[in-house]
Amino acid sequence: MKKQRCPNPIFSARCPNPIFSARCPNPIPSEVNMNIREKYEQFEMEHLSEYASKALLSKGRMLHEPKCEIRTDFQRDRDRILHSKSFRRLKHKTQVFLSPEGDHYRTRLTHTLEVSQISRTIARSLNLNEDLTEAIALGHDLGHTPFGHTGERILKKLCNEFKHNEQSLRVVDILEIRNGKPGLNLTFEVRDGILNHPLKYEPATLEGQIVSISDRIAYINHDIDDAIRGHIITNIPDKFLKHLGSSHGQRINTMILDIIQNSENKNSIIMSDEVATLTTELRDFLFENVYYNKIAKSEEDKTMFIVEKIYEYYTKNFDSLPEFYVNIYNNNNFSKKEIIKDYIAGMTDRYAMKVFEELYIPKPWL
């Protein structure tokens, strides 16, 4: 099936500013006069694959800003994401299992870090831009809701439309504040990779394609690992053990190696037909036996109720939202529904439960 570009109205695939052209009109300075950033940029131009994205040739940012003397544009984007509030909140957002009692289950933050590790391994092996890859990986899930995909589904129902990838872009473009201004002002390449990371879309760069496929590798394998630890399943079917590997690490290694072998010196990131088919079948096994099991379903109904009641309250009491969100509404052309969605999507699991309690659970008054 042919992949498509994500049709997000807040994202322009082409920057109209001529200073952001794909070809840099400025020659690389002589090495004697180079600062640290320029040496990085020269190294990328001379040593990375012809298919790699180069910081010097970036299409640039929506708002022009002075260059850093030490870091390339992609390195700066990575750091801006890493230091953002939205990134820190990922540690208290569900990956699959809601508020597990054990300390070793994945959260949305640990998932993000595993995607980053897998992505960087592939990018380095293919001689692509590791900094760009890391920035996209760290930012790809910033827009995820509390309570995992359950939260996403109920917000989609309530708002008629919600996609976590589009919300992630909205976070870095609007909701994060940097130097007193909305948005992190990231480069085109990072924004494109964040928006188009779901596997049905096609990022503009190979680095973005790496994150897209690494996201699937990460969640399939770590969700199996967590499901076995939580006694939801005892193991996976024999054919996956035989062809992909008998351990968590072996399966990840098989998938990564297959991608590297099939993508080397090519302008696309692909798996072999055999491993791609097995990966898809393993994902189907997860949906049937883990994501939609009876225990998960019972907890899912509770979390959907929490999100639905919070949304219902603020549609009737919009001015009760935190001042930050009311100000966004007053200073922009967004609907109240969009602002309420922004507020709920940014919540952690425990904050959503706290808000629900404050709104609906009576407190002793004597």
What are the residue ranges of the model-derived segments?
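Short, conserved acidic/polar surface loops in the N-terminal third of protein domains
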Residues: 93, 144-151
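Active-site-proximal cofactor/substrate-binding loop regions of enzyme domains
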Residues: 111, 124, 131-143
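Short active-site segment of divalent metal-dependent hydrolases/proteases
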Residues: 143-144, 218
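Histidine-centered, transition-metal-coordinating active-site segments
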Residues: 33-112, 116-122, 129-130, 162-366
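Post-HEXXH active-site segment of zinc metalloproteases
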Residues: 131-135, 148-161, 229-233
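Asparagine/serine/threonine-enriched low-complexity, disordered tracts
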Residues: 8-10, 17-19, 26-28
